[in-house]
Amino acid sequence: MTIAISRPRALVVRAPGTNRDSDAVFALEQAGADAHVVLLSEILETPSLLHNAQMLLLPGGFSFADALGAGRLFALELSTRLTAELAAFVAAGKPVIGICNGFQALIRTGLLPGASLKAALGPNDHGRFTCEWVQLQPVSQRCIWTADLDADIHCPIAHGEGRFVCDDNTLAALRSNDQIALRYSSPNPNGSVADIAGICDTTGLVLGLMPHPEDHIVPRQHPQFIRGHRGGIGLGLFQAGVRHASQL
C-alpha cells in the first residue's frame, strides 16, 4: 500500500551563479513541498542526499557564468558524476524540473529530450538577451507537471539562449510522444521551433522550460496587479509536481 507523504522533500540545486534558488523554494513551499536549497558540491560529494528527496529542481541563473555556453559546465558536473544517481531518481518515479539555466543543463546532459533524441537551446533569433512576460499554453497529457493544467500561465522569461531547436525527426518524435509540454501562446519571443517553451522526457517526469513560472506564484507578482490583473499564476504547475511526489 502506498502511503502519501504530506510534504514531499524537494531539493533545489544551487550551482555557482544560479540566482533563482529562493524563488524556486518559495514556489515549491507554496505548492506544499518541504523545499531545501542544496549546493551542487554537496550532492557531488554525497550523492545519497538524493535518496531522501522526492523532487529535484535545477533553477535558473548563470551557472558557472555560462562559461563555454549556457548550462554547459552545470551539465558536465551532473553527467560525469551523477549519471547513475539521476537515472535512479527518475526510475523511482520522482519528478525533476529544470527552469531556464536548469533546462539548458538538462538538455546538455541528455536527460531531455531523452530516448536518443537530440535538441539544443541556441541564441535567441534576434541576437539579444530578452526579459519580458509571456503566455504559456500547457499542451502535454504525458507530462505529470502539465497534464492537469487547464489554463495558460503568464510568467517572465529572462534569457539570451532560449531558442529551442531540433531536427525534423526529433520534432516529429516529440509530437507523437506528447513530449511538447508547453508552447508560447503569446508571440514567440526567441524563435523556438514550433513555439516550444518546454518539453518533457518519455516518462513525463522530467520537465524543462525556459520561462519562469516560479516568478508568478501569487497575483501581486504580476506587473499589472495594481491595474486589476488576475489569473495565469504558475502555482498549479508546481502543485502538480508536488501531488505526484506525495504519492511516492
Regions found by a protein language model. Name each.
Residues 1-99, 103-113, 123-130, 193, ...:
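N-terminal beta1-alpha1 cap of cysteine-dependent amidohydrolase-like domains
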Residues 2-3, 42, 48, 86-87, ...:
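Amide-donor transfer/coupling interface in amidating biosynthetic enzymes
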